[in-house]
Amino acid sequence: MSSSPLSKKRRVSGPDPKPGSNCSPAHSVLSEVPSVPANGMAKNVSDADIDEGLYSRQLYVLGHEAMKRLQTSSVLVSGLRGLGVEIAKNIILGGVKAVTLHDQGTAQWADLSSQFYLREEDIGKNRAEVSQPRLAELNSYVPVSAYTGPLVEDFLSDFQVVVLTNSPLEDQLRVGEFCHSHGIKLVVADTRGLFGQLFCDFGEEMILTDSNGEQPLSAMVSMVTKDNPGVVTCLDEARHGFESGDFVSFSEVQGMIELNGSQPMEIKVLGPYTFSICDTSNFSDYIRGGIVSQVKVPKKISFKSLPASLAEPDFVMTDFAKYSRPAQLHIGFQALHHFCAQHGRSPRPHNEEDAAELVTIAQAVNARSLPAVQQGSLDEDLIRKLAYVAAGDLAPINAFIGGLAAQEVMKACSGKFMPIMQWLYFDALECLPEDKEALTEDKCLPRQNRYDGQVAVFGSDLQERLGKQKYFLVGAGAIGCELLKNFAMIGLGCAEDGEIVVTDMDTIEKSNLNRQFLFRPWDVTKLKSDTAAAAVRQMNPHIRVTSHQNRVGPDTERIYDDDFFQNLDGVTNALDNVDARMYMDRRCVYYRKPLLESGTLGTKGNVQVVIPFLTESYSSSQDPPEKSIPICTLKNFPNAIEHTLQWARDEFEGLFKQPAENVNQYLTDPKFVERTLRLAGTQPLEVLEAVQRSLVLQRPQTWADCVTWACHHWHTQYSNNIRQLLHNFPPDQLTSSGAPFWSGPKRCPHPLTFDVSNPLHLDYVIAAANLFAQTYGLTGSQDRAAVATLLQSVQVPEFTPKSGVKIHVSDQELQSANASVDDSRLEELKATLPSPEKLPGFKMYPIDFEKDDDTNFHMDFIVAASNLRAENYDIPPADRHKSKLIAGKIIPAIATTTAAVVGLVCLELYKVVQGHRQLNSYKNGFLNLALPFFGFSEPLAAPRHQYYNQEWTLWDRFEVQGLQPNGEEMTLKQFLDYFKTEHKLEITMLSQGVSMLYSFFMPAAKLKERLDQPMTEIVSRVSKRKLGRHVRALVLELCCNDESGEDVEVPYVRYTIR
C-alpha cells in the first residue's frame, strides 16, 4: 500500500494552564513515561514479557494490552488440511499461549493442493502429527502439540478458543453448543472449491475494548458555548474526524474548567468542525484553548450459539454486488453437509447427477427454514456450481478464509477489533472459465497427484498452463513469502518450461520472522530471496524458482531487459514503497504484461489487477500526498508529539549524517565549495558553517570533548533557544489584532534546567555524545556514572537573549528571508575553512539512521531529544515504542492481513492465466479485517483519448523503426517528416526522459545542427550518456499539433534502434 502508518496523536490531560494565557507551568509531565534502565540507557519498555524485537510490527496493530491477552490464550485448531494449517500458521505467528492441532485423518494426494506443510512422502500419515514439528518452528514462544483422539468435552474444556475446519455439521452443532454453554469461543471455517464460509460465536457477554483499532483522534478547541447541549467548535486547520456516539474528554480548556478531567462524554456531530456535548449552561465562561480527545469506551456484545444462529443467521457482506448470495449459500452449505452425510463424500467434480441431487436437497432445506431465512426463489445455478467445485481444495481460497479466521481467533483472545457477526460467505466464481462449456467431468477427474484439489475445480488444461507460466516476483518480504507459498501450491512455474524469478536485495532481520513465515531464527542475516526460494522448494520440489538480489530500477535494466520481459507471462509486485511500484507499473505498461499489485497497512489491505489493453494501470490513480508539517511549526511552534519526533529526526540527520558527508566531500572533491555556492537561498551558508564547525570549532579530540559538546548542545536546544524565543515573543504577547500570540496551535514553551540526576537528561547526553564520537571515529562509553562525573566539570557559558534576532512565524516569512544571502559571511567562511591538504587522511563517518537496532543509540537519541522538546512545550511524551513507529515511519503489519490479501491476488492470477477478457471478470479488492469490511469492484477501464478519429489508451504507442532498409538510422528531420506524412501531426516538442531533443522555440543554429543528426546521437549528446548495448528501443514523448494547429494529446513513441 502506498499509505504510511496512521499515527494520529492522542492527547491526555495535563496540568491546568495559567489563567489568561496559553502558557503552562514550567514543570515536566514526563512522570507519565516509565523509565527502565536497559543497555545503559533509560528506555520505555511497556512489558518485559513481550519480545518487541520479534513482534514489533504486530504490536503497532494490536497494542501491548491486546498482545498480553493473546499470550494467555490456548487455541485448538481441528482439521489440518489446507485451511486448518493456514489458520494455525497465522495464530502461531501471532503469538498465542499455545496451539493444539487436531486431526484424525491421514494425508491424501488432494491435500497437497493447499496443505503446504505436507510432503509427498507424508501420504498416508496423520496430518496433525506430520504438521506439528513444521508449525512449531514458526514461533519458539508458542508450544505446538498434536492430538489425534476424539473431540470429547473434557478435552475441549482446556481451551479458550476452538477452531473447527472442514468438519461435519453434526460435529459443529455438538461442539458449538458445548462451547457456548461453557464460555469457550468458537470459530467455524470451511472452504469448498471456490466457496468459503466462516462463523463466529464469542459468547453472550464479550467485552470489546476497541472496535476499529485506529489511534484515538484529538483536536484543538476554539470555542465552547454555554448551552444545552453545549456546542464545541474546533480549529479549522483540520476536520475533527469524530462520529456521533463517540466519547471524548477535554484538557487544557481555559475558563470552562469544568470540562477538564471530566468523565468521557458522548457527542453528536453537527459538522466537520463542530459537535455537541452535555449541558454546559451552568459552566464557567469559555475563554480560550483546550484539547478534545477521543476516548475508547469498552462495550459488551452478544453472540448466538451455532444452532440458534444457523436457524436465524446474521451475515457480514463480502461483496455488495452479490447482495443476496450469503442467504443462498447459507442454504447451499447446509445442503452440502446433508449430501456428504448421505454419501460419505462430496459431490463429484462437474457431475450433473450429483449437482441435481444437491439442488433437490437445498430445496428441502429451504422449505423447512424459518420464514425470515427462507428464500423465495432458490438460485439453482449457484447451488449447481457449488456442487461442481465442492470437492476442490484451493490454496488461495484457504489463504483468504484462513487469514480472516485467524484474525477472528485473535479478536476472540484479545477483545480488540469488531468480530464477524456471525456468518460470512465468500465466493470467487469469476475464476471459472469465461467459456461455460470449457470444463467437463472428465477433465476434472483426480490424477492421483498433488494438484488433484485444484484440477477438481479448473480441470487439467489450466493445470498444464499454470506449470508453463514464467512470472517475475518483485520482493520477498511478507507478501512475497505468501505469494511464493501460493505459487508452489497451485503449481505456477512448476513445469519444465515454467519459471518464477524472485528478486529482493534485503537480508532477513528478527522483526521479519513474525510475518515473513518462510524464514526462521537461524536465517537472520541471510538473503531473503535465496532463503524464500529454498523454503518453497521444500513445499513443492517441482517449483522452478530463481532468486536474484537486485533492486528494480533504471540501474538494473541491463539485467531486466527486453529479452527478460518479453519472455514473461506476468509480474507480481510485493513491494513496500510507491516509487518502486510505479517503476514496475511503467515497465509492465511498456512491455504490455499483466501486473498483480497488492499492499497492506495493519489490518487493511488492497489488491489491484492490471491487464494490458483492458484496465487502467497502477499509476493511473494515486493517493493524495501526505500532509507535511510546516517548517516553522517544527522549529518554533510544535503542538503534537509528531512534531517533536520529526524535529528529533531532523536533528539526527543534521548532527550525525549531513555534516560528516559534507566534510568528506569538502576534503575529497575540489569542486565541492563551487557546487555548494550554487545552491539556493541560505543553503550555501548553512552547509559551509556546518563544515567549519565540524573541522574547526567543534572537532573533538577525546571522549570527554564529546560529552562536553553534548552538554552544550543540550543547553542550546532546550534552554537557550527557548529563552530567545520567549524574549522575542513573551508569554503575554498580543498579535496586531489584540489576540494572545500564544493561543490556538501555538503552545507557549518554557526552558528546561539541566539536571544530571534526571534520567532523560543523562539519556540525551550519553546518546548524543556516543553518536558524535562515532562520526569522528572515537570510542564512546555507556557508563552512566562516569559520564555523570564528566558532566560535573563541564563549564556551560552564560546565555543572555539577544535583541534583533529574527524568528519567523510562518513559512512564507522564512522563504522571504531565505531569498537574501549574506555574501560577506560566505567569503569569510571560504577564507577560514582549513585547506584539505592540511588534513591528510582525515575523514568523518556519517551515520545512517537505523531504528531496529537497540544497541546503536539511534532511537535512544530520538526518544530523548523528542521528549525533552515535548517537555519544553508541555506536550505529553511518547514512549520508545510509539516514538519508533512515528520517527521510523514503520508500517504496522500482521500475518493475517497478508495471508488474506495474497489469497485474493492469487484468485486474480487464475483469471490472468486463463486469459479472461471481460472487465467484470476481474476484481480489485479492499479489506479492513478490524471492522470487518470488504469491498470489491471491477477495475476501471483504461481511459480513452482521441486525435482525429484515432482512439488510444495508455497501452497504445507509435512504433517507429529507427534503422532504415539501407542500414542507416533515421535523422531528426526524417523523424519529424515521418509524423507529418504518416500521421498528419506536427511535432512541437520531442523529449527522451528529461532530455529535450527538439522544440519549436529552439535556437535556429542549434536546430540546424540537429536536424541532420541520427536520433540516437542527439539523445547521447543531450543526455551526456552513452546508450548501453542492452537498449533496443527508446521511449520518446511528443507534443503535437494537428492540421488545424490545435494541440492534441498523443501516445508515446517506441523508437526501435536494434
From Swiss-Prot:
Chain positions found as Phosphothreonine: T800
Gene3D superfamilies for the chain: NAD(P)-binding Rossmann-like Domain, Ubiquitin-activating enzyme E1, FCCH domain, Ubiquitin-activating enzyme E1, inactive adenylation domain, subdomain 1, Ubiquitin-activating enzyme E1, inactive adenylation domain, subdomain 2, Ubiquitin-activating enzyme E1, SCCH domain, Ubiquitin-activating enzyme E1, UFD domain
Protein species of origin: Bos taurus (Bovine)
Post-translational modification: ISGylated.
Keywords: Acetylation, ATP-binding, Cytoplasm, Ligase, Mitochondrion, Nucleotide-binding, Nucleus, Phosphoprotein, Repeat, Ubl conjugation, Ubl conjugation pathway
Modified residues (N6-acetyllysine): K671, K980
Compartments, record wording: Cytoplasm; Mitochondrion; Nucleus
UniProt-listed Enzyme Commission number(s): 6.2.1.45
Coiled-coil intervals: none
Swiss-Prot/TrEMBL Sequence repeat ranges: 63-199, 459-611
Pfam families linked to this entry: E1_4HB (PF16191), E1_FCCH (PF16190), E1_UFD (PF09358), ThiF (PF00899), UBA_E1_SCCH (PF10585)
Binding residues annotated for ATP, in chain numbering: A478, D504, R515, K528, D576, N577
Organism domain of life: Eukaryota
Further comment found in the protein's record: There are two active sites within the E1 molecule, allowing it to accommodate two ubiquitin moieties at a time, with a new ubiquitin forming an adenylate intermediate as the previous one is transferred to the thiol site.
Active site: residue positions: C632 (glycyl thioester intermediate)
Purpose of the protein: Catalyzes the first step in ubiquitin conjugation to mark cellular proteins for degradation through the ubiquitin-proteasome system. Activates ubiquitin by first adenylating its C-terminal glycine residue with ATP, and thereafter linking this residue to the side chain of a cysteine residue in E1, yielding a ubiquitin-E1 thioester and free AMP. Essential for the formation of radiation-induced foci, timely DNA repair and for response to replication stress. Promotes the recruitment of TP53BP1 and BRCA1 at DNA damage sites.
Positions bearing N-acetylserine: S2
Protein's name in the database: Ubiquitin-like modifier-activating enzyme 1
Pathway: Protein modification; protein ubiquitination
CDD domains, alphabetized: Ube1_repeat1 (cd01491), Ube1_repeat2 (cd01490)
Chain residue ranges for the region called 2 approximate repeats: 63-611
GO MF, one example: ubiquitin activating enzyme activity
Residues modified to Phosphoserine: S4, S13, S21, S24, S46, S810, S816, S820, S835
